[in-house]
Amino acid sequence: LDGRGGDRIVRPLLAALDRDGGRALPMTESLLSRISGKDNPQMVLGAFEQRWQDPGRITPDAGRCWIALDRVRDPGNLGTIMRTADATGARGIILIGDCTDPYSVEAVRASMGAVFNVELAQMPEDDFLDLAAGWPGQIVGTALPASRDYRKVDYAGPLILLMGNEQAGLTPALMKACTQLVRMPMMGRSDSLNLAVATGVTLYEALRQRHPPEDG
């Protein structure tokens, strides 16, 4: 922090940090700027240990879904998906194969803090296929060749929502592991949506089905 430890907003943060055994280090604004990579940094920066879920502890949840991402490469997409996962109450995110780092600066910024609220796990494709083989509920994947409209699928849990790589989509093995393959209608000249947008649209359809809007 930049020396404003007496600030009314900062004081409770410092008290909580002290209770949990953390350390507070005062530093100059110029050093904060160098660490954050921003010309006008916030007056407080935090450093936290990365949290990863043990893949062996990924369990079905009837009321919430897991999001599985196949080789997602764009940190902005991943950060936005983490934010949407948190907003829709998803259980967590499974990163399959060679994915971008969810703890990179770009991903953390795009998540707007949601990186600390969702469970994250990573595994190779073969391990995910083993998980999928024993999954007791639906695995819904999005794919351009699919013929079923995403709005006509029952997203009852336990659910895995499987999303493909930004350029290549899902691998053939992952598509085969899905219980349903869905598409989104494209009414204009574009043939697909951005990965983060497509994930958000599908998550909110699943949320709408689980929690339909009240009358009035």
Region locations from a protein language model:
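Histidine/lysine/aspartate-rich catalytic loop segments that bind and position anionic ligands
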Residues: 91-134, 138
